[in-house]
């Protein structure tokens, strides 16, 4: 919890980070692995890094502009994300898996003035056609690309942030490249409301962050940790999850069902002590989770929670502490959130609700009505106020990794082949499949 901080009075993220720096000056706020060595970062060092990178942004005449961020989940990516917020600019985190064509489309859609990237993304970033300033997080040999590593060695710039709660600071894209991307607008106010108040309703000391930053969970969880005085353990890639659990020893982790299943395979065979883990709380979200996984977790004495949210609400919405009596329910509205039903569709409302979709008034007016976000999910509620998902209003497939896939888009691409007459794309046992009727030669 963020005791002593009245988050409702915070105007912007410079105010927020300045307060957090003073509170956590000599506290470990971030941990990550460098090879097999655990690196621990104190608050004074983390926020000094944020100040330095924010100075580079201002000296490059980018303050207040839309700045893209692309790369692997890392300490450097977190510092740059926070630096963009600190200056009152707009952070637009994009997937590192985009093609050059897709990246150009998003650069144009989000009206980016600059793109900050880790060095592994340099090749694709150099293919951006628009007049965008490029900043490499590390060193670069490209003459017209700024090096954040070199520029931050220069004197700091005195930063003034005059933005207010209603000013935009983040554009997030819904779903992956396989669904129609909508650019979600978050303001100082919605991002503060989505991270400072209690999220999980349980006590914990450190949380593991592995999600890509272009997923809302990827950048919200670190801000939750920083704002609530927890240690943020940063992992890069789900494939190394067991190393992170063993060496960084977080006591809280948020997972999608596919990862929870992997965790449960270990927990069925070993105790946490044998594994070297320290988990007290597991939160599962992103897609419907098989109830038998909950039972495995709870048998090990770990608190199990199921969460339901969206990019539009910064992941907040409905949450449930799983017990033997409510395995099928997604729970009740979380702290500060409200839920309702309209013609069977689940609606959400709360202070972390986004300000709409960027440059898309038609979709905004369809999705947000009288302050309520229409999720597109169908649900039921019982007499105790517990919600249960029953289906999708829109025909989307939600994979076990949380990604939304539009079957119609896949069908439209495959049907172009002259050998195919009809196609039906569907989900079965966690995989996407298709029923195809060939166009036989006459």
Regions found by a protein language model. Give the residues of each.
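Gly/Ser/Thr-rich phosphate-binding loop
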Residues: 251-255, 263-326, 338, 421
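AMP-dependent adenylate-forming
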Residues: 17-42
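ANL superfamily adenylate-forming
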Residues: 122-165, 267-270
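Conserved pre-ATP/AMP-binding loop-to-beta segment of ANL
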Residues: 26-28, 152-173, 180, 200-206
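Conserved AMP-binding/adenylation subdomain of ANL enzymes
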Residues: 192-206, 213-278
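Conserved ATP-binding/catalytic segment of the ANL
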Residues: 333, 347-399, 404, 416
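Conserved AMP-binding/adenylate-forming
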Residues: 39, 56-98, 210
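Conserved AMP-binding A3 loop
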Residues: 40-43, 169-194
């Amino acid at each position: 919890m963020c005791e002593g901080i009245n988050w409702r009075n915070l105007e912007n993220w410079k105010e927020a980070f300045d307060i957090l720096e003073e509170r956590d000056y000599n506290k470990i706020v971030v941990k990550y692995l460098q090879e097999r060595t655990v690196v621990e970062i104190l608050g004074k060092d983390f926020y000094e890094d944020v100040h330095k990178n924010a100075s580079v942004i201002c000296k490059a005449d980018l303050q207040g502009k839309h700045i893209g961020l692309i790369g692997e989940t890392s300490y450097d990516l977190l510092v740059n994300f926070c630096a963009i917020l600190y200056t009152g600019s707009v952070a637009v985190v994009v997937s590192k898996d985009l093609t050059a064509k897709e990246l150009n489309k998003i650069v144009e859609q989000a009206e980016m003035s600059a793109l900050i990237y880790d060095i592994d993304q340099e090749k694709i970033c150099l293919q951006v056609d628009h007049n965008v300033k490029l900043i490499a997080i590390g060193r670069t040999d490209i003459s017209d690309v700024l090096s954040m590593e070199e520029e931050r060695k220069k004197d700091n710039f005195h930063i003034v942030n005059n933005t207010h709660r209603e000013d935009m600071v983040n554009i997030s894209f819904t779903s992956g490249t396989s669904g129609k991307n909508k650019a979600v607008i978050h303001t100082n106010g919605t991002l503060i409301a989505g991270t400072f108040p209690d999220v999980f309703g349980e006590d914990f000391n450190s949380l593991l962050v592995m999600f890509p930053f272009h997923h809302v969970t990827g950048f919200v969880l670190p801000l939750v940790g920083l704002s609530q005085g927890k240690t943020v353990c940063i992992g890069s890639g789900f494939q190394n999850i067991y190393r992170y659990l063993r060496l960084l020893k977080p006591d809280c982790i948020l997972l999608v069902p596919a990862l929870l299943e992997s965790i449960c395979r270990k927990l069925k065979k070993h105790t946490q002590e044998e594994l070297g883990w320290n988990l007290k709380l597991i939160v599962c979200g992103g897609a419907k989770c098989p109830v038998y996984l909950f039972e495995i977790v709870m048998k090990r004495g770990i608190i199990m929670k199921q969460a339901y949210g969206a990019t539009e609400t910064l992941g907040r919405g409905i949450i449930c502490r799983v017990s033997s009596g409510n395995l099928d329910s997604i729970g009740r509205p979380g702290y500060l959130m409200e839920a309702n039903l309209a013609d069977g569709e689940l609606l959400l409302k709360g202070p972390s609700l986004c300000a709409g979709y960027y440059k898309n008034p038609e979709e905004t007016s369809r999705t947000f009505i009288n302050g309520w976000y229409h999720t597109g999910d169908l649900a039921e509620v019982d007499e105790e106020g517990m919600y249960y998902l029953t289906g999708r209003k829109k025909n989307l497939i939600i994979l076990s990794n949380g990604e939304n896939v539009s079957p119609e888009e896949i069908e439209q691409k495959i049907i172009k082949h002259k050998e195919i007459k009809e196609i039906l794309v569907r989900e079965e046992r966690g995989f996407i499949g298709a029923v195809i009727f060939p166009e036989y030669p006459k």
